[in-house]
Amino acid sequence: MAGAFAFAQSLPVAITFNGQPLEVGGARTLADALDASGFDPRPGDLVAVDGSVLEAGKGEPFHAAVNGQVVSDLNRTLANGDVVEMGDGSPTEEPSDIVEEAIPYTISSEGGGAIHLLEGQGADGLRQIKTGRISGIVAEATVREPQNVTRRNVSPDVGDEKVVALTFDDGPWHDTTVEVLDVLRDHGAKATFFTVGSRIEGEGIDLVKRAASEGHQICTHTYTHASGSGKGVNLGFMAPDEQTAEIEQGFAAIENAIGGEASHIIRTPGGNYGDEVMRAIGPKVSAEIGWDIDSQDWRRPGSAAIANQIKSAWPGAIILMHDGGGDRSQTVEALKDALPYLKEQGYRFVTIDELMSYPLA
């Protein structure tokens, strides 16, 4: 029995070597197959991190696969029916020290409209910097390209429809918001309120509830109007986590008041929506809203001057006003003058959501 087994072990095996049938005797290893085939693989080179040759023939001695599995041991035993593919060795890169660093994604801007949309994933890429331990050569390679962002500044194409969007910032504000809501109700006008979240408490909750129940859109203008490190005007002065908190807390204040999900359309304090702000809060918002017409009511130039700004509206325009931040009695009086005038011209007053339902370009 033992003799028969030994005899069987000494028989050659039939394999396929680089597409050709081949009998392999001896120990029936990959080395034996290489000898029997007459194939003489050329070893690869030892190369630097930049691909230049350091030593010819000092790389991978050969490249082989048995039945599709890569093999580097010439003592691998073969069996009948094995399929062997063998070729020249590949270059071997010198050992190196590796440092990885992010490639920041970029934000480009196109268009001049007051509705600001972000397109793109906004993900950093990855760069690898290798320093060869033998050569001392430094080589850089991009492992992952950044996924850049485009800020599209668009306007609604309202065609022949005379629609405008009235927007109010910095409320809710005790008497003023009530008066603004009364004027809007009296003229069948809808508006969008960009609220300061910290003011949505007590009476502020009731005012937001009333505005929502009367068909107005409630959006955030941040939680504190970027107070503190934002100096009350620019989220970009704040750390990214502070910016995110301003938006998330603003959403939460609205949701607490209305009992439903807050709109993710926002307006930043001062309309400051630069790259550093877009990077921090862009993923959390669906659109940032600027304005086409600044009523200048924050300057308190008189109700007539404010009314004239409002009356200058054109189809699709977004008008900036304030129901909070101080005495807005001039704004209330201006609305009483301007809204009837615009209605006589055939205008309707819509929310930002309604305005954005038109084609945007």
Where are these regions (language model features)?
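Short phosphate-binding/catalytic loops that engage adenosine nucleotides
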Residues: 39, 189, 216, 286, ...
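Anion (oxyanion) recognition and catalysis
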Residues: 35, 185, 212, 282, ...
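Solvent-exposed coil/turn segments that connect beta secondary-structure elements
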Residues: 69, 83, 89-91, 198, ...
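Catalytic domains of cell-wall/extracellular-matrix polysaccharide-remodeling enzymes
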Residues: 179, 201-206, 225-348, 353-361
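N-terminal pre-catalytic segment of deacetylase/amide-hydrolase enzymes
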Residues: 54-56, 73-74, 79-165, 174-178, ...
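Active-site beta->alpha N-cap acidic-glycine motif
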Residues: 134-235, 246-249, 253, 257, ...
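Ubiquitin-like/PB1-type beta-grasp interaction modules and other compact soluble beta-rich domains
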Residues: 1-102
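Soluble periplasmic/extracytoplasmic beta-strand elements of cell-envelope proteins
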Residues: 14-16, 83-87, 165-167, 192, ...
